Swiss-Prot record:
PANTHER family: RIBONUCLEASE P PROTEIN COMPONENT. The gene is rnpA. InterPro entries: Ribosomal_Su5_D2-typ_SF, Ribsml_uS5_D2-typ_fold_subgr, RNase_P, RNase_P_CS. It is an enzyme of class 3 (hydrolase). SUPFAM superfamilies: Ribosomal protein S5 domain 2-like (SSF54211). Consists of a catalytic RNA component (M1 or rnpB) and a protein subunit. This is Ribonuclease P protein component. GO terms for molecular function: 3'-tRNA processing endoribonuclease activity; ribonuclease P activity; tRNA binding. Pfam families: Ribonuclease_P.
Amino acid sequence: MLTAAQRLRRSTDFAAAVRGGRRVGRGVVVVHLNVPGIPPEASAKPARAGVEETLAPARAGFVVSKAVGNAVVRNRVRRRLRHLVRERLTGLPAGSTLVVRALPAAAHGSTQRLGADLDAAIAAARAQRGRRSR
């Protein structure tokens, strides 16, 4: 289970991640990853000794539409994704926002396939951070 600080709840948080993040689809999932940049004024300030900065943890949210299946199937897919993301959330930079959207084929996919597709999508989204498309 994700902690309360790690979950996306408000629609504005989901919208910000989807609109501002990188979108990558792999297999049965589509990942929207938004990694905040470091503001230029933050890097110019020297760090104070003995003061540890508290950064917001990486947060995740899930979108599983009715196209995936009935409520039982959707909740099963959501539980699997939540378990898989919990293990991978610590590898994301602090302050990141991750939205995982399950495609209809996720209802029939195994947990191993969901995990492999999720890993591939997150890796591709992180690799795209330096590139600009268009």
